[in-house]
Each structure stands twice: as C-alpha cells, then as structure tokens.
Amino acid sequence: MTRISVGVDVSKNRSTVCIMDQDGKVIMRPFLVWHSTEELDFLADTLKRLNGEVRVIMESTSIYQYPIALHLKEKGIFISIVNAYKVKKFANTDFIGGKTDKKDSRTIASYGISYWDKLVEWQIPKDTYFNLDLLNRTYMNAKKHRQIILQELQHYIDCAMPGMDKELHSLNLNTKKDFMLDFVEKFWHRDEIVNMTEAEFTEVFTAWAKEKGYRPGKGKAAKIYAIAKSCIPYYPANPTVKTILQCIVDKLSGVNRTLVTIVTQMIEEAKKLPEYQIVREMPGVGDPLAARFFGSAGDIRRFKNSKALVAYAGIDSPPDESGDFSSTHRHITKKGSKVFRDTGYEIMMALRAQKRTWEKVRKNPDVYDYMLRKEAEGKPPKVAKIAALNKFLRIIYARIKELYDNMALAERAKAKTKSKTKAKTKATA
C-alpha cells in the first residue's frame, strides 16, 4: 500500500496542509485549512478518499495543534504529533533555507516519509491525565505571576525593613500559609516594631503567631526585633507607603489563593490514579509534589522504557566519542520538559532535607543513599541531585509498570473465571 504523508503546519486559527507520497511527490500542493468544523470535515473526507495509508504529521506547538488533531482522530485518521525540535533539525538539511507556511508543511510531510516507521500515533488523553495537565499549566502560569509580585514585596521589605526577609519564609502549599505575607501585613514597617520594647513586641508577636496558626517562639521574636533595631529603612512610615504595601499584599493574597485552589484540585484528580500511591510513598514527595509530578509527566505507560522517561525530563547525558577521544564529563541534554525537570528537582531538594532515620526514608532508602554516595564521591550538590533524580525516575517507572502488569493479569484471570462460571451454568442447565 502506498504511504501518504500529510504535513500540517499549525497556526493559531488556521493550518497549511501538504500531501506527499512515499516517493516524495507532492499529491496536493500546500493549501489553507481554517480550524472550523466544515473545513476540517472537508479535509478528513479528502484524506479518506486518497488511495493509500494516510498519516497526518504535525508539530507540537503549545496547544494550537490539539483542535485539529482531536477532530481528525475522531474521524479515524492516524495522527502523529512530533517534537518541533526534531523537525527543525530535519529542516536544517536544506541549504537554501527560507521559511514560509507552505515550505514548512512540505518539510513536515517529508519528515513523515523519512521517519514513517518511527511515527508514534497520538492518543486522546484520558480525562484524569488531561485535567492534571491543564491544572499544571495553570499552576505554572500562576507561579510565574506570583514570583513577579513576590519580588515586588521583597523590594518593599528591603526598603522598609532591610534584612528582615532572612527571617520570613514564603508560601507553604502543605500548610497553605504564607508567613512573609502575614507578617508584613501586621508589622508593615520597621517603626511598627521598634516603637515597642522587646518584651512588648515578643508578647504581641507570640500572640499574633498563635492566632495565625504559626509556632510562636521567643527566639524568633528576638531575632526579628534585633534586625528591626539595627536596620536603616529608606521608606518612611507614612500612609502612602502603607497603601503601597496593602496593594502588594492584596495581589499576592489573590495569587496564593489561586495556587492553593489549583493544587487542591490537582491532588483530588491525582488520587484517582492507581499509581498515585507509588509516587506518594517515596521520600521527599508530599501530596502537592505527587500531583504536580503526574501533571507534568502525564501517563508514564506511554514511554517504552525508563530511558525514555529520563530523556523526557531532559536529564539524560548522551555519549560523546570521536576517534580515540571519549568524554568523561558529559552534560545533561535539557531537551525534555522543563516543567517536569523542575518538579523532579524540587522532589530531590525535599528529599535531601530529610534524615536517614525518618520512616519514609527508611522504607525507601535507595534514592537517598545514592544521593549521599554521589556527594561523598565529591560530586557538586546539583549534580548529585540530578543523578538521584535519574535513579528516582527509573524506580518509579519500574514500579508503575509492575502495578499495571499485575492489574492486567488480575483482569484476565477474572475474565477467565467469569467465562468458566458461565460455561458451568450452561452445562448445568
């Protein structure tokens, strides 16, 4: 059967389509298709009338490829969404260069012919994984927005009570509390602290901390009072400065509520997955990080082996050899998902902060011990964490695969027992 590759260069509201056969001959010159039901139905009918095996190839360009991919997939057409970087490297073989939508659609169609046997069919994601991916994208956008506002708040602290930020920790998604935000809302200027004696401030601070649900400590109060006493503020303690702070606090409070809402929903969705407890039981992983792990990784079963999962995180280090030269100091590729890599690194940071005697570490010590061993070998802390993350992902992949294999065996055994019971019932009748 003739192989027919359909290259789709996706844009926001329209796509350019080129249809090419296995010999590289253009069957239909590049044409424009708008992302409407009528035009996509026309495209699907056109592709079905072609005499051959049709595969539609498009680049992964954020979210714009999904409407057309979903519509054509529901029509029974093979869809493959490929990494845009792969197509870019493939296009670099063209010495002439140049870039237009028509030229790009030809390049994508040509890529489909060249890598026909390696094309992976895109599957419509299940509801849980889809929801987690959507929530994770929203979480990352809100997190970026929060970082901008947090920098604004830290700038305010540097001008109103310099040095105080060392004693103020930010939002904790486990407790859903933000000590820095609550503190500056109560003690908005250095003068608010030093106008009291240390004993008076300690009493006020401990009462406030207890009311807010923090651990009130006289030692913490003494440190804060000492910083306030010695610092030199640039901002005066006047109504204008207080109004500016209140605006920052309101913005940051809103983003914090958004983040807490998103993470709470992510945890609820992630708990529906059979493999959730496997990740949750690993040391360094709480409910928020476990939910974000699946939000950024998706369905682990789609990877053919653990190496593919490691490569998706972009922490694989390919060989570097030429002639007699063989590199011993290789860097990670960083070609995978940055969000997944960042989430994994956060897990390793949380794991490193734990102790060997803690229950979760004692039950699953492999990754923790491996990280310590790498540090003992003289590896920099970041390198040791990335190496440990590599091991962490391999362990997770093996355990999830084993879980689903056992579930499949149990399902087959159940079906077999059911069929035997039916057969016995018929025989008795």
List each language-model region with its residue ranges.
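A detector of single, family-specific signature residues
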Residues: M1-A429
